[in-house]
Amino acid sequence: MKYILLSIIILSFTHVAIAQQSDTINKRSIIKRSILPVSLITIGSIISGSTFEKNLQTNLRNAVGNDYEFRIDDYLLFVPVAELYIADIVGAKSKNHWFDQTKYLLISNILTAGITHGLKFAVGKSRPNGGTHSFPSWHTTFAFTNATVVYNEFIDSSPALAYSGYLFSTTTGVFRMVNNKHWLSDVMVGAGIGILVTNLVY
């Protein structure tokens, strides 16, 4: 329950702060685009520390081998950023000029990093490998923040490119679990924060 309350409180403050900066935000659009990330945050918070989550992690590690480690997740989270600027270089039509893209990218990452690290220290959840500050996953938050910037920039002109960032961010989250660095709930909440905050920034 404390995970849910912390997530809701922090994200609510973020929502209010961003919403006050613009009178042109379409409230209906915000609600529609918030359904998925809020669901991820809520469900992730509910299953955090549950027997289901622990059994899932145990079964996953048994399937890949307890000594398995493939640190591709340390690199995949940057791919959406590379996609964004490569698309600009080759002349792909986007919603905003590269300068504004960079502005939204930085604002989104600063906000999501603050929220994620704030929750990490407030919650103090242990990682499946015995480490600390597990909830939520910063790698996943960062990856989904960047992927959501790509989505917002290219969804109207190039849907395939817009959705491609989520392929890399999802893979990042999966490998955080495969490498025994995070639980499912850490990944779900991290993804939800990245998507929600970035959509609010846009």
Tell where the protein language model's regions lie, with residue ranges.
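Hydrophobic, lipid-facing residues on alpha-helical transmembrane segments of integral membrane proteins
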Residues: S39-T42, T102-G118, T145-N146, M188, ...
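Small-polar-interrupted transmembrane alpha-helices in polytopic inner-membrane proteins
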Residues: L84, L105-G124, A162-V174
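Short acidic, glycine/Ser/Thr-rich loop/turn "cap" segments at secondary-structure junctions
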Residues: W98-K103, P128-G131
